[in-house]
Amino acid sequence: MLAKRIKWFHVLIAVVCVVGLIGFFHNHSLKKETVMNKVRTDSQYGNVEIATLVNDGKTFNYAVNYPVFKNEKMDSALKRFAEKEVRQFQKETKDVDQEHTTKRNELNVDYKIVHYAKQTVAIVFNEYKYIGGAHGQTVKKTFNYDFSKQAFLSIDDIFKEDADYLHKLSLIAYHELKKNKDIAADDALLKEGTAPKKENFSRFAIKEDYIELYFDTYQVAAGYLGEQSIAIKKSLLKDILKEQYIDKAKNKNKIKEQKPKHEVISLPKEETVDPNQKVIALTFDDGPNPATTNQILDSLKKYKGHATFFVLGSRVQYYPETLIRMLKEGNEVGNHSWSHPLLTRLSVKEALKQINDTQDIIEKISGYRPTLVRPPYGGINDELRSQMKMDVALWDVDPEDWKDRNKKTIVDRVMNQAGDGRTILIHDIYRTSADAADEIIKKLTDQGYQLVTVSQLEEVKKQREAK
């Protein structure tokens, strides 16, 4: 009996030893790859601390720096951001084969406080990540925090509610970056990267005198050109920027800010319309159709004219590039319903859905929300007008190109009825109409007409009436 007890005692001791050894080696392993959170003081801003997440592991290493402002809401969010970057990196490296490479996977995140004032602080994170392959990847991530709102800001938040800020930023960015010949070499990429979409302008910093925009590698130019940035003078945006982000006292930096590398101090020259010269508005319905619509856009560009395209939501969803090109080249986009029904035969609810769904898809693709609507067949009533809250744009000249598919017939009908201040209706989905439009655009230009959008035409009429 005693021998059995001794035997079980020895077994128990052995088990404890094994468990202890396992625990020792397990703890030793954790210690070796422990994530350390170091804290030190920022050299520029004494009230800001720098926290660092570090791991110097066998197969990967990372160092993630982030600022601590002693502002609970902001600090919590920045800490979550840093930890999320680490978790994402660990997830991405989990299954990477390290047997055939001597280079460890790496994540390095550093930051710079580019602006710190009473109103806001702007933090730009620079992230380098290497996970196998020939090269690592570098990206920028920005945070703008409003102390009065106690909230982080998106690009939407800094502009006035009804401001068409995306188109203004798009216009400025495109023309500024195009001044660099190397960037201008790939015009299609530049246009895509500066198109009026929120995601193209999501990396920004509110500074003392500027709104600085950042563009990642490959966004607007070939990879070898790297990241790009432009800093737009706030004075150029004063008509659309919210007052609290312009106020000198509130936006005065705690230290002297560095002068930006690429400063924008003047707006690109926009073509103006002379109200004393003949004007005519070409309008195109039922598109887009890439083949024929782009043909018309080519002619407008060649003769430095503009037009208004009343598009169908059902077609826009399939041809977003054509829609973006329309806007990028200074043309106007209007709403022509989703699927071209006679709106007055629908219930008000159904008719509004046709319009609103089209508004939404246009805005989703381009960032632009039309102000003009052209009801199919011109069918409209007072109730719909009041409910839509959009300007209704009809026409003066209809060559019935949808019925008579003959280029000469279409050209003759338009030219015979063309006149100063008139609006022409053509459909951009037919080849014969596109061919006719080429000739019409040339002839009208030769006759001294300025080819304008519907909105420009209305503005000219107002200017003339005011005289």
UniProtKB/Swiss-Prot annotation:
Its EC number is 3.5.1.-. The record marks 401 as: Raises pKa of active site His. One of its GO terms (molecular function) is metal ion binding. GO terms for biological process: carbohydrate metabolic process. It holds the Pfam family DUF3298. Its main location: membrane. A divalent metal cation binds at residues 286, 336, 340. Induction: Negatively regulated by the two-component system YycFG. It is found in: Cell membrane. InterPro entries: DUF3298, Glyco_hydro/deAcase_b/a-brl, NODB_dom, PdaC, PdaC/RsiV-like_sf, Peptidoglycan_deacetylase, Polysacc_deacetylase_ArnD. PROSITE patterns: NODB. The keyword Signal does not apply. It is a single-pass membrane protein. The chain crosses the membrane at residues 6-26. GO terms for cellular component: plasma membrane. Disruption phenotype: Cells lacking this gene show sensitivity to lysosyme, in contrast to wild-type. Residues 278-452 form the NodB homology domain. The active site is at residues 285, 427. In the N-terminal section; belongs to the RsiV family. In the C-terminal section; belongs to the polysaccharide deacetylase family. Catalyzes the deacetylation of N-acetylmuramic acid (MurNAc) residues in peptidoglycan, a modification that confers resistance to lysosyme. Is not able to deacetylate N-acetylglucosamine (GlcNAc) residues in peptidoglycan, but can deacylate chitin oligomers such as GlcNAc4 and GlcNAc5. Is essentially not active toward chitosan (partially deacetylated GlcNAc polymer) and has very low activity toward chitin (GlcNAc polymer). Does not deacetylate GlcNAc. The product of deacetylated GlcNAc4 by PdaC is GlcNAc-GlcNAc-GlcN-GlcNAc. Derepression of pdaC in cells depleted for yycFG leads to increased resistance of the cell walls to lysozyme digestion. This is Peptidoglycan-N-acetylmuramic acid deacetylase PdaC.
